[in-house]
Design a protein with these regions (language model features):
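Acidic/His-rich, divalent-metal-binding segments that scaffold phosphate/diphosphate chemistry
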Residues: 21-102
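Residue-identity detector for glycine
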Residues: 14-19
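Charged phosphate-binding loop/patch that engages nucleotide di/tri-phosphates or the phosphate backbone
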Residues: 185-204
Length: 204
């Protein structure tokens, strides 16, 4: 077991609005993560480092584009919890020793967060895989998911989904270039790539 600290340097990076609310939510999301990850410190470290990187990029997008009207506080909160479901998945390369297919981590995380009373955060979980997954994608690829659309709808969902594509949990110390992120998302199909490119034009 390692002694690396997995906590972000500040409860809400970049000074998100609402100091008291920020600290309060920091306590809440850490309690949620600890509830599921306390016995898996290596996986917790991967989750926290990845989530903080995604949150920071998402906040930079919010700051660069105030015209989007994104809820900065919610963006940070949801980014820190968007991958909570990986603990149930079978992906030993990133210390996940569960039983579920990795493609399911979004809907698994959504179920976990709904149980915690966090409906809006749950929607981010289930809509962030790839550039969102359509029912047609799921049927065509024969993924073990409900035949429903899991596509980012709100601006906050879109920002987090986009920011997430620049960071891999396999290499938590690296940030992908735009070209690398595009290559990753292209694996999900042309529709996903087109959504990503639209976000790229809007957010960069």
């Amino acid at each position: 077991m390692h002694n690396r600290s997995c906590q972000p340097s500040h409860p809400v990076a970049g000074g998100a609005t609402g100091g008291y609310a920020s600290v309060l939510f920091y306590m809440i999301y850490k309690q949620i993560i600890d509830k599921y990850y306390a016995q898996q410190p290596d996986l917790m470290h991967i989750l926290m480092v990845h989530s903080e990187a995604v949150a920071q990029r998402a906040l930079r997008i919010c700051d660069a584009h105030p015209e989007l009207g994104a809820d900065r506080q919610f963006v940070y909160e949801a980014a820190m919890l968007h991958d909570i479901g990986i603990v149930q998945c079978d992906a030993p390369g990133i210390c996940c020793h569960g039983t579920q297919p990795y493609i399911c981590h979004g809907i698994l995380g959504a179920k976990m967060l709904r149980a915690e009373g966090l409906e809006q955060h749950a929607r981010v979980c289930e809509r962030h895989t790839g550039a969102g997954l359509s029912a047609d994608d799921i049927i065509r690829q024969q993924w073990p998911l409900p035949h429903l659309d899991f596509l980012p709808v709100s601006i906050e969902e879109q920002i987090i989904c986009y920011a997430d594509k620049f960071y891999s949990k396999s290499h938590i110390d690296r940030e992908k270039t735009l070209a690398q992120a595009e290559k990753t998302i292209a694996r999900f199909g042309q529709d996903s790539l087109e959504r990503f490119l639209q976000w790229e034009r809007r957010f960069e």
